[in-house]
Amino acid sequence: MAVFHDEVEIEDFQYDEDSETYFYPCPCGDNFSITKEDLENGEDVATCPSCSLIIKVIYDKDQFVCGETVPAPSANKELVKC
């Protein structure tokens, strides 16, 4: 069982669109991070690369659902929308 340093709402994170990663300041001076893909996969733990602390990310999992299929334009195929 993991021991979380804190529980933080996703709205309190900074989002980097280029890397599709959410960041939150860690007490050690670095940043906790979690990717959009991690959230889509149901992950809720953000880690710090510089220390052993982890935090639980509080978010609405329905906003990060991956796997919805949509018709592909001009094709007889379906695409997965993420």
Swiss-Prot record:
Fe cation binds at C26, C28, C48, C51. This is Diphthamide biosynthesis protein 3. Required for the first step of diphthamide biosynthesis, a post-translational modification of histidine which occurs in elongation factor 2. DPH1 and DPH2 transfer a 3-amino-3-carboxypropyl (ACP) group from S-adenosyl-L-methionine (SAM) to a histidine residue, the reaction is assisted by a reduction system comprising DPH3 and a NADH-dependent reductase. Acts as an electron donor to reduce the Fe-S cluster in DPH1-DPH2 keeping the [4Fe-4S] clusters in the active and reduced state. Signal peptide: none annotated. Its cofactor is Fe(2+). InterPro entries: DPH3/4-like, DPH_MB_dom, DPH_MB_sf. Residues 4-60 form the DPH-type MB domain. Pathway: Protein modification; peptidyl-diphthamide biosynthesis. The lineage of its organism: Eukaryota, Metazoa, Chordata, Craniata, Vertebrata. Belongs to the DPH3 family. One of its GO terms (cellular component) is nucleoplasm. It catalyses: [3Fe-4S](1+)-[protein] + Fe(2+)-[Dph3] = [3Fe-4S](0)-[protein] + Fe(3+)-[Dph3]; 2 [3Fe-4S](0)-[protein] + 2 Fe(2+)-[Dph3] + NADH = 2 [4Fe-4S](1+)-[protein] + 2 [Dph3] + NAD(+) + H(+). Gene3D superfamilies: DPH Zinc finger. The keyword Transit peptide does not apply. Component of the 2-(3-amino-3-carboxypropyl)histidine synthase complex composed of DPH1, DPH2, DPH3 and a NADH-dependent reductase. Interacts with SERGEF. One of its GO terms (biological process) is protein histidyl modification to diphthamide. It comes from Homo sapiens. Its main location: cytoplasm. The DPH-type metal-binding (MB) domain can also bind zinc. However, iron is the physiological binding partner as zinc binding impairs the protein electron donor function. Keywords: Cytoplasm, Iron, Metal-binding, Nucleus. One of its GO terms (molecular function) is iron chaperone activity. It is found in: Cytoplasm; Nucleus. Pfam families: Zn_ribbon_CSL.
